[in-house]
C-alpha cells in the first residue's frame, strides 16, 4: 500500500472510497471489502479484508478496515470518504462522526426515512419533483440513523434518484459522490 502511494505520487487531500465486491476465480467466489484512494479517476485499493461469508459487510468489518487504513495512513489528509447504499446505519455513522471525524458522502436508499423534527418522510418523497439532471439539497439537516445529516439528491438519466447523506459541505455532496464510481474501475 505504501509503495502504491509512493509510486503514484497521490497528492493530498485524498478521496477514499469503500466498496465490497465478489471476485470469481473458476468456481471459487471471494467476497472482498476494500478501501482505496481515488486518483485520476481510478481507485487504487490500499487495504482490504476477505469476508468469510456471502453478502454485505457489517459495521465491525468496516471499522476494522478503516482502522487498518488509519494505522498505515493516519498522518494523511483525507478530504472525504465515499460509499454506496450498502454502507449505512447508526453504528457506522457513529464511527465516521466520532473523533477524529471522517467526512463522508454516502448514498442512501430511496426508502430511507428522513425526520425533520416534526414528521418523517421517505427520501424519494422529498425529491419526487426533481426532473432528469436536476439536483437539490434540503435546506436543513434531517435525522437519519440518529444523526442530523444534510441530504442532497439528483434525478439520474434512467429516472432513479441519487440521494447522498453528508455531515459537511452539503452543496458539494452530489459532485463529490461522483468520485465514488472510481472504485468500480
What are the roles of these predicted feature ranges?
Residues 1, 10-14, 25-28, 39-185:
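Single, function-defining residue in the core of a domain
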Residues 19-32:
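An active-site-proximal beta-strand-loop segment
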Amino acid at each position: 500500500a505504501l509503495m502504491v502511494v509512493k509510486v503514484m505520487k497521490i497528492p493530498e487531500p485524498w478521496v477514499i472510497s469503500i466498496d465490497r465486491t465478489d471476485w470469481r476465480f473458476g468456481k471459487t467466489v471471494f467476497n472482498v471489502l476494500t478501501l482505496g484512494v481515488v486518483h485520476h479517476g481510478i481507485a487504487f485499493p490500499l487495504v482490504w479484508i476477505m469476508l468469510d461469508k456471502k453478502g454485505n459487510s457489517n459495521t465491525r468489518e468496516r471499522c476494522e478496515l478503516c482502522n487498518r487504513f488509519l494505522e498505515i495512513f493516519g498522518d494523511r489528509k483525507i478530504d472525504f470518504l465515499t460509499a454506496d447504499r450498502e454502507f449505512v446505519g447508526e453504528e457506522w455513522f457513529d464511527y465516521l462522526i466520532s473523533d477524529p471525524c471522517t467526512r463522508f458522502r454516502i448514498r442512501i436508499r430511496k426508502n430511507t426515512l428522513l425526520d425533520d423534527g416534526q414528521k418523517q418522510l421517505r427520501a424519494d418523497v422529498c425529491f419526487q419533483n426533481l426532473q432528469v439532471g436536476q439536483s437539490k439539497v434540503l435546506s436543513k439537516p434531517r435525522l437519519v440513523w440518529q444523526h442530523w445529516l444534510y441530504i442532497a439528491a439528483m434525478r439520474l438519466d434512467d429516472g432513479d434518484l441519487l440521494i447522498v447523506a453528508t455531515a459537511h459541505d452539503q452543496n458539494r455532496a452530489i459532485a463529490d459522490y461522483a468520485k465514488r464510481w472510481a472504485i468500480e474501475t
